[in-house]
């Protein structure tokens, strides 16, 4: 299963997403509760529809799958696909145009390909370990540290509140995979979530893409993040475009 194969799979899924899921954008019916996911979160109708769409394409390949809504499907394959069928489902249901679908492919325990697709802008982000990060086919990099204070996405329940005094502005956009993609293309200087809340499915693709764009990615203890193949782990994530910003944030979390 070469890179070209996985890109074609992703493009097929995106095409189906545009046709099947996008008509529900801003429709309250998409927010109907369907079930409780293995991670303990509520699964809305649109989450289930998006997951069913993606799983129908991926499970036929005989690979392992990790998804927020269904948990783990172990087919004893050397390939594992971690998916977030609808990153930012609240935004989607509410008609807020900031959401995405994300997919990360691993061979054994090594990432080999990741995509994040933002339907509202038709931005197609790709991360290819060892080759780089791309937006609609063009290489992207995190932006150099600006002369002014940085701008970050920041999620907290009180921990690290002093961080806001050391940045120019903060945003809480509600779709962390897409926010990591925005870090990769230079729209944000950092993405920080210290709620012990995000799951591997939320950040698998985003961390691959951001890292390939030059981002530094750690947990709140300053350790590398290990993306596990399950849907229930809860993580902190600190992804930034410079060593200086990383040191500042970690020092304020001590």
Swiss-Prot record:
Activity control, per UniProt: Inhibited by Li(+), ADP, ATP and glucose-6-phosphate.
Per its record, the protein catalyses:
beta-D-fructose 1,6-bisphosphate + H2O = beta-D-fructose 6-phosphate + phosphate
Q: Name one GO molecular function term.
A: fructose 1,6-bisphosphate 1-phosphatase activity
Question: What processes in GO biological process is this protein linked to?
Answer: inositol metabolic process; signal transduction
The top EC class, named as a word, is hydrolase
Q: Recount the entry's temperature dependence annotation.
A: Optimum temperature is approximately 100 degrees Celsius.
A Pfam family cross-referenced in the UniProt record is Inositol_P
Subunit description: Homodimer.
Write down what this protein is called.
Fructose-1,6-bisphosphatase
Encoded by which gene?
fbpA
